[in-house]
């Protein structure tokens, strides 16, 4: 990968140090006061991680974002921001070109060498902890609230999430028949992977009170027609980038033809296919309670069709 010349990195670093130092000096002499608008205190942020971007926006700091990664698709307005590319393959030049003061990344962001060079350029790089539970989500909100110095907004968001989660638990307490789900992660029509255990998809199914029909392996992988027939899924949940949420009755031969074994399972009916936006189900951001509830209700409704 082509890298910036050291002089260019140092130039960006010096400029950002002057910006940060200027704010500190003004505050030290009492010029900055409580009447100063919040927007003027915000720093330039690059965010890497769709769920993290959603939290930042939910806290009211969308205007601070100057760049996002390819998984940051919500709210829709962030799609117009400059992209720094795929989270695991960040470009040093691409990030520095946006002159960020903070880069907030998820657990899988990298390469590590790029993050280290950003720190050398005096950019504050913070890695947000991972997790697919409500507690993990709340921890992320707290951490980001501290990074952005908006603890009050973070606490308000946490309170909202707790209220939504309590309502969700009441819904999940209503008994329902066991529904065996084949969860398909679809990136392109030619790249369809089925979710096993230790995946975000498996966590979502458990949250929604659904059963993963492919619990015999870990991660995401292709499966054979024989494996599908043996699993006997009742329902297929397919995630696609920017799909409508939710949509059932998928009518795509290019997708169905990849899973010929489905014709010998209860999931053969078109009404037993549910299509969701990938990041809606798998970002584990502030929309988590709503996504779980929608997945459960859509699954139960599809089984009645």
Regions found by a protein language model. Name each.
Residues 1-13, 23:
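N-terminal secretory signal peptides
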Residues 39-44, 102, 113-190, 211-216, ...:
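Extracytoplasmic substrate-binding proteins
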Residues 44-113, 240, 244, 259-262:
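A short, structured surface patch at a secondary-structure boundary
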Residues 92-99, 224-232:
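Short helices/loops that flank or line small-molecule/ion binding pockets
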Residues 102, 234-235:
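Short, Asp-centered acidic motifs that coordinate Mg2+ and/or phosphate
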Residues 111-120, 237-256:
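A ligand-binding cleft/hinge motif common to bilobed small-molecule-binding domains
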């Amino acid at each position: 990968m082509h890298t910036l010349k050291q002089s260019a990195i140092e130039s960006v670093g010096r400029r950002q140090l002057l910006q940060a130092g200027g704010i500190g000096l003004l505050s030290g002499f009492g010029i900055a006061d409580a009447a100063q608008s919040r927007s003027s205190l915000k720093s330039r942020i690059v965010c890497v991680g769709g769920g993290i971007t959603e939290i930042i926006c939910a806290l009211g700091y969308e205007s601070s974002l100057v760049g996002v990664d390819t998984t940051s698709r919500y709210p829709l307005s962030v799609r117009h921001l400059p992209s720094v590319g795929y989270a695991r393959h960040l470009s040093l030049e691409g990030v520095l070109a946006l002159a960020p003061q903070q880069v907030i990344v998820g657990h899988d962001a990298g390469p590590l060498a790029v993050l280290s060079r950003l720190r050398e350029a005096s950019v504050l790089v913070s890695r947000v902890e991972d997790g697919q539970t409500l507690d993990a989500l709340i921890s992320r909100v707290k951490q980001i609230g501290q990074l952005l110095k908006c603890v009050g907004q973070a606490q308000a968001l946490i309170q909202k999430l707790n209220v939504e989660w309590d309502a969700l638990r009441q819904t999940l307490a209503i008994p329902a028949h066991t529904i065996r789900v084949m969860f398909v992660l679809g990136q392109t029509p030619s790249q369809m992977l089925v979710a096993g255990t230790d995946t975000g998809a498996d966590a979502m199914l458990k949250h929604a009170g659904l059963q993963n029909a492919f619990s015999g392996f870990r991660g995401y992988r292709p499966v054979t027609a024989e494996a599908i027939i043996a699993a006997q899924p009742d329902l297929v949940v397919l995630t696609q980038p920017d799909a409508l949420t939710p949509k059932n009755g998928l009518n795509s031969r290019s997708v169905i033809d990849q899973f010929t074994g489905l014709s010998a399972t209860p999931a053969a009916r078109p009404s037993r296919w549910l299509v969701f936006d990938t990041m809606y189900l798998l970002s584990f951001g502030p929309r988590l309670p709503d996504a779980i509830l929608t997945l459960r209700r859509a699954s139960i409704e599809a089984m009645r069709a």
